């Protein structure tokens, strides 16, 4: 790789879609990231999917999950990179978006006729490059 190409990669941060994809594609790095972002220590990663597409009916809104990770204990982590310049999310919309993603993930996990006890422990994380609620906190959780 020439110096120009090397310098281009050195300037990228995890907020860049390309770099986020490269980093989260690696199960070891994805697990460390999940350990840092969740209140639990993740087990060994069983699988990582980038840009996982979920749509349960043709007429329903689909979601494309940036990084979908499942560990050996059945925990699921969806990590989304949210750049203000790429996609403005209003304060009222972000919690509703999380709710919708949770519902879509739950539908993916639970087959028809399966008891609700089999829903998995799930974490949905939005890494925002801005303060989405403008009250000067680094972490918001529900």
Residue ranges and their predicted role:
Residues 1-142:
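Elongated, amphipathic alpha-helical interaction scaffolds
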